[in-house]
Amino acid sequence: VLSPTDKTNVKTAWSHVGAHAGEYGAEALERMFLSFPTTKTYFPHFDLSHGSAQVKAHGKKVGDALTQAVGHLDDLPGALSALSDLHAYKLRVDPVNFKLLSHCLLVTLALHNPQDFTPAVHASLDKFLSNVSTVLTSKYR
């Protein structure tokens, strides 16, 4: 559960992401594919090379979904229900991959916003991404 302080930290941090959400999403995906090569198995039809239009497009989807989640911190299950259905029933993504992408997102955010990435903000963003991952895997049962 996100505390009021966590919610403030997440909203403030995400306000600095702003228009870069898609770019950061794509960078985090690239970082994940390079650091955890087994994650590529879910994207056999993608060109996974650096700067790929497909990775950029998927990164935008990731960024947009997280922006939506930030706007609905009090109702993540409602805000992410359709995305949860997609990942559970159609894509069948192994839940561990959400943790890997979350880690890569944290690295990307820290790299681009070092002055704002305090230990408290890091902890709040980690809790937020963990909650998002939990919601996205909640329908796997």
UniProtKB/Swiss-Prot annotation:
Subunit comment: Heterotetramer of two alpha chains and two beta chains.
Covalent S-S links between cysteines: none
Underlying gene: HBA
Keyword annotations from UniProtKB, A to Z: Heme, Iron, Metal-binding, Oxygen transport, Phosphoprotein, Transport
N6-succinyllysine modification, residue list: 7, 11, 40
Origin species: Rhinoceros unicornis
Tissue: Red blood cells.
Binding site for heme b: 87
Signal peptide from the UniProt entry: none
GO terms classed as biological process: hydrogen peroxide catabolic process
Matching CDD domains: Hb-alpha-like
Function field: Involved in oxygen transport from the lung to the various peripheral tissues.
Name this protein carries in UniProt: Hemoglobin subunit alpha
Domain Globin: from-to ranges: 1-141
Binding site residues for O2: 58
Residue numbers bearing the Phosphoserine modification: 3, 35, 49, 102, 124, 138
